[in-house]
Amino acid sequence: MKISENWNINNLTMRKAKIDDIKDLNSICASWEDKILLEGEGFPKGYIENCINNGDLPPIKGADISNYYLMIIQKTDGEIIGFFDLYHGYPNNETTWISIFLIDKAVQGNSHGKEVVESICQECKNSGWKSIGLGVHLKNWKGLRFWTNNGFDRIIGVWGDKKYSETAFSIIGLKKELI
């Protein structure tokens, strides 16, 4: 079960990232100004390059880059407005996992995110996947609202620091069944 490496919806194209995209993707990463506040850390140096070359693989035995997709969200005029990744087969063999989903701050609020999530769900369903999972930092209220409003409403776990503080961080795992 593999998704397509390229698909279109309305005025957007989703395609697998290439080395030539690094500059644009780093710029989109930089547009997430409150990442450190919400997650406790910024993007590691070389994050995008590492995702393209090695994948951002889950912590499971046998994780393989052939199951990893870093995907670009691109307007028909060629402008890259975001990216996301998918890992096929985590945390189980029927689930695809999203570990990052980011729309450039300059174009947020135009329903691009909702449209892309709907297309990801349809693409995964068409490819035979039963569900999509993801993790959201609990301090990321905007992200929690976005994902729950898009049907990711089943809690699959909570991980992280056990005591709350300004410097403590936890993640909630959410899942959407593809019926």
Feature locations, PLM:
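Conserved GNAT acetyl-CoA-binding A-motif
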Residues: 124-135
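Beta-strand secondary-structure signal
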Residues: 69, 133, 173-175
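Conserved glycine-rich acetyl-CoA-binding loop
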Residues: 79, 104-118, 127, 138-144, ...
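Conserved catalytic-core motifs of GNAT/GCN5-like acyltransferases
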Residues: 133-137, 148-170
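Short secondary-structure boundary/hinge segments and terminal tails
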Residues: 47, 125, 142, 154, ...
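Terminal substrate-recognition subdomain of acyl/acetyltransferases
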Residues: 1-5, 164-179
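Acetyl-CoA-dependent GNAT
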Residues: 4-12, 16-108, 117-119, 123, ...
